[in-house]
Design a protein with these regions (language model features):
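Extracytosolic ligand-binding ectodomains
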Residues: 1-239
Length: 239
């Protein structure tokens, strides 16, 4: 959806040769074609090579309005972007969640202006509080940091509610502390939440990612559209 909304009509895709990369590349390709976007090439890259000129050459020959980079910053993604910029093959990049991080913009700066991607996240009250809380404590609130924080918090709250630290107790109580009803607990308020839960009061943990679970225990998720402007990542919209 984001690629289509940006007016891009053709893309080449490169993906890291792992289950993550293969699966996401297949899903992206199918979604792109369904929206009328031409996929000019789809090629894998290994995550531990010293030279990616061959991969960049194939992608450059195929062409496209943008290059979709599905992978990780430290496993070939940066090098493929560098090669694409150096050869003039591409100047707009569509980034998977594993490619979104401050190290990318620290390396390339405004050369990536106009590039974009998506990652799990929210623009809700909890997410904004977590971002401020993390930055105040010297933590980069990048991809999956909020989810990791919330997972640890939910385990501790479930232990408090159930009065035990065994896995069965956590499993039996985690839905209650995540979905409520009860006192809302946001990022940075874990101490308050633990005190309430351990004292027998009901809590509704929202945390950093506005946590809620379905009846079968799957997390409701939201995604952030991220753009690069002025050499920095910006939050464009919640999807």
């Amino acid at each position: 959806d984001i690629t289509s909304d940006r007016g891009i009509s053709s893309v080449a895709i490169t993906y890291v040769n792992t289950d993550y990369g293969v699966g996401l590349a297949d899903v992206y390709e199918a979604a792109a074609i369904a929206r009328g976007i031409e996929v000019t090439a789809k090629t894998a890259h290994e995550g531990d090579k010293a030279d990616y000129s061959a991969e960049v050459g194939v992608l450059s020959s195929a062409g496209g309005d943008a290059l979709v980079v599905i992978g990780y910053l430290d496993q070939g993604g940066n090098q493929i972007i560098q090669g694409s910029l150096d050869t003039g093959a591409f100047d707009t990049f569509v980034l998977s969640d594993g490619m979104i991080g401050e190290s990318l913009t620290d390396t390339f700066g405004s050369d990536l202006d106009g590039s974009f991607g998506s990652m799990p996240g929210s623009l809700g009250a909890g997410a904004m509080k977590f971002k401020a809380y993390a930055e105040a404590n010297g933590v980069d609130p990048s991809v999956y940091v909020g989810e990791s924080y919330d997972a640890a918090a939910l385990i501790m709250l479930a232990m408090c509610k159930g009065g035990s630290d065994d896995s069965a107790t956590v499993a039996a109580n985690v839905m209650d502390v995540a979905n409520g009803p009860g006192t809302k607990i946001y990022a940075g308020e874990l101490k308050k939440g633990l005190e309430l839960a351990c004292a027998g009061f009901a809590v509704d943990y929202d945390g950093a990612t506005d946590v809620n679970f379905t009846e079968v225990g799957e997390a409701f998720g939201a995604f952030l559209e991220k753009g690069i402007e002025g050499g920095k990542f910006t939050d464009v919209a919640q999807r």
